[in-house]
From Swiss-Prot:
Subunit (UniProt): Monomer.
Protein's UniProt name: Peptidyl-tRNA hydrolase
Role this protein plays: Hydrolyzes ribosome-free peptidyl-tRNAs (with 1 or more amino acids incorporated), which drop off the ribosome during protein synthesis, or as a result of ribosome stalling. Catalyzes the release of premature peptidyl moieties from peptidyl-tRNA molecules trapped in stalled 50S ribosomal subunits, and thus maintains levels of free tRNAs and 50S ribosomes.
Organism of derivation: Nitrosococcus oceani (strain ATCC 19707 / BCRC 17464 / JCM 30415 / NCIMB 11848 / C-107)
Top class in the EC scheme: hydrolase
Amino acid sequence: MATTTWLLIGLGNPGTEYAQTRHNAGFWWLDAFASELGINFKPGAKFFGDYARANWRGHDLWLLKPATFMNRSGQAVLALLNYYQIPLEHLLIAHDDLDLPPGVAKLKRAGGHGGHNGLRDIINRLGRRDFLRLRLGVGHPGSGQDVVSYVLNRPSREDRQAIEAAIGAGLEVLPEVLAGEMEKAMHRLHSQS
C-alpha cells in the first residue's frame, strides 16, 4: 500500500487564556490524537503554528495547530500545504461548531464557513472550499449577539465531557477517513449522534 500524506489541522486560539475555551475544540481533538500517538508538538515559525509529524497506519501525517489566532488560520494551513505539496483532498480540519450540540461530531466534505472565522480565512486563502471538516459541536448560546463571548468561554463540566466524547468519536473514524472511506466514516460517526 502506498504511503499517503495528510495534513490534519485543529483550529483554536493560541495561549493559556484560550486553552480551555469552546473555540479550541479543534485543538483538543488534535491534542487527543497526538497523545494517542505519543508525539509532541513543536513550534514551527515557517508554518505559523505548532506541528508534529507521525507515520500512522501507512499514512505520513502532519498535525498542525495554527498560532495565528482564529481569523488568520489560513496562513498556517496554506504554508504547510504548499511547502509539502499536500493535495487539498488530504486536508482535514477539526473545528468547533455552534450549530451542533455538545457531544455531536459530524464529517463534512465541503461547504461554506458557516460564520466560523477560521474556516472563512482558510477558504479565502485557499480560494476553494472543497476540503474535509470534522465539526465538533459546542452548542449555541441562543442569541447571535452572545456568540463571541460564548465561544471564548469555557464549557460547563457536562458540556466538556460531551465534547470529549465527540472528540473520541471523531478519532474512532479517522482510519476510514484516511483510507478514503468517507461514506463508511460518515455513516459510523453520524449514526452515533
